[in-house]
């Protein structure tokens, strides 16, 4: 986080054998870790991004299918609120995704960005797509989307900013076990 707090997304199973996604954090460089409440039940494979100073977004695979679940915490997971885009804005068939937050000073657009990748479909794992949101994840406009791979694949991906102009994505593609692309 911008204040130096280390944060990782988590998933765990409770006695009901239902998975839950949340976060764990350390304020002392990783010596001690804390975890509070889960964000949403029956979710896994989450990604966490700081969308404003002290505000974390958890973007989760929702095992109910159809779309991503998204929640916000302002207190390191003690309380969560459902984000307005949750279960609406990001179609998905139940798969892992990638999400990164890129600050205005770190990209050539000079705007705060959320960059997201997943199979952009509600059935199967194809149409691997990168999307950019300019409004904190509320909208993901078609003009800010890039279809990388129409073919069937495993669908997992990992995003990174290579430099101020280049997004890197490592993903399970239809033409190779793993493909690395710089955009």
Predicted regions and their residues:
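Aromatic- and glycine-enriched pocket-lining scaffold segments that form the walls
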Residues: 1-25, 29, 33
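Entry beta-strands of beta-propeller and related beta-repeat scaffolds
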Residues: 3-8, 54-57, 108-116, 165-169
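Recurrent small/Gly-Pro-centered beta-turn motifs in extracellular repeat architectures
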Residues: 10-12, 59-62, 117-122, 170-173
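Short, solvent-exposed loop/turn segments at conserved positions within beta-propeller repeat blades
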Residues: 14-19, 63-66, 122-126
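Asp-box/BNR beta-propeller loop motif
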Residues: 24-35, 71-82, 87-89, 123, ...
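Conserved blade-ending motifs and adjacent loop-strand segments that build the rim/top face
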Residues: 88-94, 140-162
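Loop/turn-rich, solvent-exposed surfaces of beta-rich toroidal or solenoidal domains
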Residues: 89-136
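Conserved small/polar residues in nucleotide/adenosyl-binding loops
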Residues: 181-183
């Amino acid at each position: 986080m911008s204040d130096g707090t280390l944060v990782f997304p988590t998933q765990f199973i409770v006695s009901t054998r239902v998975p839950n996604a949340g976060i764990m954090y350390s304020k002392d460089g990783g010596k001690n870790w804390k975890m509070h409440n889960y964000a949403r039940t029956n979710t896994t494979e989450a990604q966490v991004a700081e969308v404003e100073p002290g505000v974390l977004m958890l973007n989760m695979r929702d095992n109910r299918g159809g779309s991503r679940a998204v929640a916000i915490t302002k207190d390191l997971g003690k309380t969560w609120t459902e984000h307005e885009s949750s279960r609406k804005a990001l179609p998905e068939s139940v798969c892992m995704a990638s999400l990164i937050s890129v600050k205005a000073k770190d990209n050539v657009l000079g705007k705060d960005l959320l960059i997201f990748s997943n199979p952009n479909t509600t059935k199967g794992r194809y149409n691997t797509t990168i999307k950019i949101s300019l409004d904190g994840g509320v909208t993901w406009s078609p003009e800010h989307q890039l279809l990388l791979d129409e073919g069937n694949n495993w669908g997992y991906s990992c995003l990174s900013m290579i430099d101020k102009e280049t997004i890197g994505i490592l993903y399970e593609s239809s033409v190779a076990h793993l493909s690395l692309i710089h955009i």
